Design a protein with these regions (language model features):
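Extracellular adhesion/carbohydrate-recognition regions
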Residues: 22-131, 170-171, 201-215
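An exposed tryptophan-centered "aromatic clamp" motif
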Residues: 119-132, 138-191
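Carbohydrate-recognition loop of C-type lectin domains
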Residues: 193-200
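A generic structural signal for short, non-catalytic loop/turn and secondary-structure boundary residues
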Residues: 9, 68, 165-168, 181-182, ...
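C-terminal motif of bacterial Sec signal peptides marking the signal peptidase cleavage site
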Residues: 14-18
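Sec-dependent signal peptide recognition
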Residues: 2-9
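Long, low-complexity intrinsically disordered regions enriched in Pro/Ser/Thr and acidic residues
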Residues: 9, 19-22
Length: 215
């Protein structure tokens, strides 16, 4: 009986010790509406403010599968002023022309390499912080459209350009050319309604760059 009491007491001490050693650890997993800063760190908005970091983008998608590259996407805080997809008529920019592909980064490089894409050049010119921003593909900008209402508050808090519902201000270039019309048209996307529109590539329209995250 004495042995039984001793064993029970020992077990109780282990349980108490285990409880005493329990610690609450902060949740550091990246989440939608986290902030990408100019130092490359992704942090909560409150931490960005308290640490005096400079924001550059807001996380709008977390990768849950292998369909997209990296761990997620962030949207740049500001619009790029209207630019033509191409300043030369009749040029293919060798994008995939696949509206379901998450390949905006590759598409933008193809556009830039052509030497005749003002929109792609404008995006490359903003790389002062080393962030590899690019023009989203149709599939990627659809993800942004789905998260717009969630991230807009944080874009505003960070001093960025809120994604507008104004029908005259909501149209953005994607990096995806129109299949079988690659030399003439690319897809324009409404971030107000989710509508796609075939558009002549020499027309100037806004760009909202995004960034692939690998945090």
């Amino acid at each position: 009986m004495k042995l039984l009491y001793t064993t029970c007491a020992a077990l109780m001490m282990v349980a108490i010790t285990s409880c005493d050693e329990h610690r609450e650890f902060p949740d550091t997993a990246m989440k939608t509406c986290d902030i990408l800063c100019t130092d490359g760190k992704v942090v909560r908005y409150e931490d960005m403010k308290s640490q005096g970091k400079q924001p550059i983008a807001v996380v709008f998608h977390i990768n849950q599968n292998n369909e997209t590259q990296g761990t997620g996407y962030a949207v740049y805080l500001w619009d790029i002023a209207p630019e033509a997809y191409s300043d030369s008529v009749g040029v293919k920019h060798n994008t995939s022309a696949n509206i379901t592909a998450f390949d905006g980064n590759m598409n933008t490089h193809s556009m830039y390499s052509s030497g005749v894409s003002p929109a792609a050049t404008a995006v490359f010119d903003m790389w002062q912080y080393g962030q590899s921003a690019y023009i989203p593909s149709v599939a990627e900008i659809r993800l942004l459209y789905g998260a717009k209402n969630t991230v807009n508050d944080y874009i505003k808090k960070c001093g960025g350009d809120v994604i507008s519902d104004d029908p005259d201000e909501c149209w953005y270039w994607t990096s995806t050319e129109v299949k079988d019309m690659e030399s003439a048209k690319a897809w324009l996307f409404s971030l107000a309604s989710g509508t796609l529109q075939e558009t002549p590539k020499e027309q100037p329209h806004k760009v909202r760059p995004i960034i692939t995250l690998y945090n």
